[in-house]
Design a protein with these regions (language model features):
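Iron-sulfur (Fe-S) cluster-binding modules
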Residues: 1-35, 44-47, 51-68, 85-184, ...
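Local cysteine-cluster metal-coordination motifs and their immediate loop/turn environment
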Residues: 29-48, 66-86, 186-196, 305-307, ...
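Gly-rich Lys/Arg/Thr-decorated short loops/hinges at beta-loop-alpha junctions or inter-strand turns
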Residues: 35-36, 149-164, 216-228, 331-336, ...
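Short amphipathic, charge-patterned alpha-helical segments
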Residues: 57, 242-246, 394-409
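Terminal amphipathic helices with adjacent charged low-complexity linkers/tails
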Residues: 95, 103, 124-125, 254-275, ...
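Hydrophobic alpha-helical positions that pack around
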Residues: 138, 267-393, 405
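Accessory "access/gating" subregions that flank catalytic or transport cores
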Residues: 167-208, 364-365, 370, 390, ...
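Histidine-anchored nucleotide/phosphate-binding helix
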Residues: 235-249
Length: 438
C-alpha cells in the first residue's frame, strides 16, 4: 500500500522521466521507442517487434533507450506503428524484420529510415503525428493517454495526473459536490441514449438502500466499433478511477466491469490494473485514509448482442440469461440483485477524471450548446484513414470522413455512411453536412 506522499513522489519523479513522451523539445539524451499494442497492431506482430527491439538494444549494449508498449495511437490503417520520442518520428507498417535497421540507422546513426516514415494520402512523407490531418482536428480527452503511456504500468498513469481526481474527490469534495460538477459539465452518456450523466448519478444517490453498485458497460456489440475496447486497452486506470469516484458519489462500495470475452487484451489489462490499484491501496479498504471502501471485479460476457442493453447486462452479471427487464423500475432504483445501480459505459467514465481536474466550465466550453465535450468514433469501411478518432461535439460527418479520414480511396464517389451500428441511420451525400450530437 502506498501513502499519499508516496504517490505524490511517484508522480513528481515519473513525470519528469516521461516528459519526452509529450515534449518534443525535452532536454534529454534518452529515447523512448513506443510500440502500439492495441488489438490491431498486436495481430500484426507488434509484440514480436517490441521483443526484437529489446533484444537488439541489449546485444548492442545501447544505453538510454527504452522500448515501451502502448495502447492504440488511432491511425490503425498504418499499423503496426512505432513512434520514437522525443523527436516524434512516426514509422508505419513496421515489421519485425525492420527493427535492426531502425536501431542502426535511427538510434545509432541519428538518421531516419525514410522508407518506413508515414505517408499521407498524397504520398507526402510525414515526420510526426502532428503533421497528419488525421490528428490536427482531433481533441483528445477520453483518449488522452492512449499511445502515450504503458497501460500495464500504474506509475506511468500516476505520472500523467492519474488518481489525482480521486484524491481531490475524497479529500476536498462532498458526494453532492461531485455530482453537481458532473451535472454542470453537461456530460451525457456516450453509450447511445445520451442521458445526462450527472442526473443519473443524482438519481442513484437519492435511491434508498445500504448496498449500491457501480457498473461499467464494456459490452461493445455494434459491428466495427472498437472505441471502448481501445480505451480499456490503452488507458485502463482511467476507468477504474472514474468508477471509484462514482462509487463515492452515490454511496457504493462495489463495482463490476462487464466486458465481452472476445476482448482478451482488454480483459488482461483490466485485471493487471485492478491488481495494481489494490496493491497501491487505491482500491480496497479506507482509500487514501478517507474511510471510503471500494473494489472492482470483472464479469465476462459471452458475446450476446442483447447484453449491451443495461438490464440484460445486469441479468447476465447475476448469472441469468441475458434478457432485458421491463422498465420501470430503472437500474437507479432496482438494478443488480434488486439494489440501486449506476451504469455508464467505458467512454463516459473516461471523461470523469478530466472533468474533476479541469472543471465543469472547461468541459462545457467544448462542443455545442446541447452536446458538450467530445465523441470517440471508430472510422472504418472504404475510407483512407481507418482508425480511432475523438472530435468535439458539433463536428460534421463530412469533416470526420474527409478531413480526418482522408476520404474515399482511389477518388471514388462517396455513397453513404452508417453511424451507431444496425440500430442507427445511414447518411447520404445530401445529409452529410449534419453534425454529430447527443
Amino acid at each position: 500500500m502506498k501513502s499519499l506522499e508516496e504517490l505524490h513522489k511517484i508522480r513528481e519523479n515519473k513525470r519528469s522521466e516521461l516528459d519526452l513522451r509529450v515534449n518534443t523539445k525535452a532536454d534529454t539524451r534518452e529515447k523512448h521507442i513506443l510500440v502500439c499494442h492495441g488489438t490491431g497492431c498486436t495481430s500484426s506482430k507488434s509484440p514480436e517487434i517490441l521483443e526484437n527491439f529489446r533484444r537488439i538494444i541489449k546485444e548492442k549494449g545501447i544505453e538510454n533507450v527504452r522500448v515501451i508498449k502502448t495502447g492504440c495511437f488511432g491511425l490503425c490503417a498504418k499499423g503496426p506503428i512505432v513512434i520514437i520520442r522525443p523527436e516524434d518520428t512516426f514509422y508505419a507498417m513496421v515489421t519485425p524484420e525492420d527493427c535492426e535497421e531502425i536501431i542502426q540507422t535511427h538510434i545509432i546513426e541519428g538518421k531516419t529510415v525514410d522508407r518506413l516514415l508515414c505517408k499521407d494520402i498524397d504520398g507526402k512523407i510525414v515526420n510526426s503525428l502532428d503533421d497528419l490531418n488525421f490528428y490536427k482536428k482531433q481533441k483528445r480527452i477520453a483518449l488522452k493517454n492512449c499511445g502515450v503511456i504503458n497501460p500495464e504500468d500504474i506509475d506511468e498513469y500516476i505520472a500523467f495526473d492519474g488518481y489525482r481526481a480521486l484524491e481531490r474527490t475524497l479529500k476536498e469534495m462532498s458526494p453532492n459536490e461531485v455530482i453537481d460538477t458532473i451535472k454542470k459539465s453537461g456530460l451525457r452518456g456516450r453509450g447511445g441514449a445520451g442521458f445526462p450523466t450527472g442526473k443519473k448519478w443524482e438519481l442513484t444517490r437519492a435511491s434508498e438502500g445500504k448496498q449500491k453498485y457501480v457498473v461499467c458497460n464494456a459490452d461493445e456489440g455494434d459491428p466495427g466499433a472498437f472505441m471502448d475496447r481501445s480505451i480499456l486497452e490503452g488507458d485502463t486506470h482511467s476507468v477504474l478511477e472514474a468508477m471509484a469516484i462514482a462509487g463515492y458519489s452515490i454511496g457504493a462500495n462495489k463495482g463490476y466491469i462487464y466486458v465481452r470475452a472476445e476482448y482478451p487484451i482488454a480483459v488482461k489489462r483490466l485485471q493487471i490494473a485492478i491488481d495494481q490499484a489494490r496493491d497501491y491501496g487505491i482500491l480496497g479498504k479506507n482509500i487514501f485514509e478517507s474511510n471510503f471502501d471500494f473494489d472492482i471485479e470483472i464479469r465476462l460476457g459471452a458475446g450476446a448482442f442483447v447484453c449491451g442493453e443495461e438490464t440484460a447486462l445486469l441479468e447476465s452479471i447475476e448469472g441469468k440469461r441475458g434478457q432485458p427487464r421491463v422498465k420501470p423500475p430503472y437500474p437507479a432504483q432496482s438494478g443488480l440483485w434488486g439494489k440501486p445501480t449506476l451504469i455508464n459505459n467505458v467512454e463516459t467514465y473516461a471523461n470523469i477524471a478530466q472533468i474533476i481536474l479541469k472543471g465543469a466550465d472547461w468541459f462545457s466550453s467544448i462542443g455545442t450548446e446541447n452536446s458538450k465535450g467530445t465523441k470517440v468514433f471508430a472510422l472504418g469501411g472504404n475510407v483512407n484513414n481507418i482508425g480511432l478518432v475523438e472530435v468535439p461535439m458539433g463536428t460534421t460527418l463530412r469533416e470526420i470522413v474527409y478531413d480526418i479520414g482522408g476520404g474515399v480511396p482511389n477518388g471514388r464517389e462517396f455513397k453513404a455512411a452508417q453511424t451507431g451500428g444496425p440500430s442507427r441511420r445511414m447518411y447520404s451525400k445530401r445529409t452529410f453536412r449534419y453534425t454529430y450530437r447527443l
